[in-house]
Amino acid sequence: MNGSNMANTSPSVKSKEDQGLSGHDEKENPFAEYMWMENEEDFNRQVEEELQEQDFLDRCFQEMLDEEDQDWFIPSRDLPQAMGQLQQQLNGLSVSEGHDSEDILSKSNLNPDAKEFIPGEKY
């Protein structure tokens, strides 16, 4: 091709290859490929609301777990140190089998002729 042929070609005429690369005709909206950005603010607002909602739920669950943790009685945490030592001493105690059952019955203040107690039954 010589220079005279190139000069006769008008710049406004595009080949099919050029139209394929840009994705649209000159008759179409030149900003068509950017139309997705039209709703970008709505999308961002929606994502931000979802993140705030998730953060709120996380904080609620953490607060609920903290309250539940406070409700539980944990001796090592809730008892003073002296009480903890007393608790250890009580855990070390055991009932001895050295007492004779006759000895216990002779010192008892219970009525041996009383009916046997059955819960829920009226006498």
From Swiss-Prot:
Domain of life: Eukaryota
Modification N-acetylmethionine, positions: M1
Pfam family, one: PAM2
GO CC entries: cytoplasm
UniProt keyword Ubl conjugation present: yes
GO MF entry, a single one: translation repressor activity
Keywords: Acetylation, Repressor, Translation regulation, Ubl conjugation
Posttranslational modification: Ubiquitinated in vitro.
Polar residues compositional bias, start-end: 1-13
Basic and acidic residues compositional bias, start-end: 14-30, 113-123
KW Transcription (keyword) present: no
Disordered, as annotated region: 1-30, 91-123
Tissue spec. comment: Expressed in brain, cervix, heart, liver, ovary, kidney, prostate and testis.
GO biological process: negative regulation of translation; negative regulation of translational initiation
InterPro entries listed in its UniProt record: PAIP2-like (IPR040396), PAM2_motif (IPR009818)
Family of the protein in this entry: Belongs to the PAIP2 family.
Task of the protein: Inhibits translation of capped and polyadenylated mRNAs by displacing PABPC1 from the poly(A) tail.
Oligomer and partners: Interacts (via central acidic portion and C-terminus) with PABPC1 (via the second and third RRM domains and the C-terminus).
Name recorded for this polypeptide: Polyadenylate-binding protein-interacting protein 2B
Species name: Homo sapiens (Human)
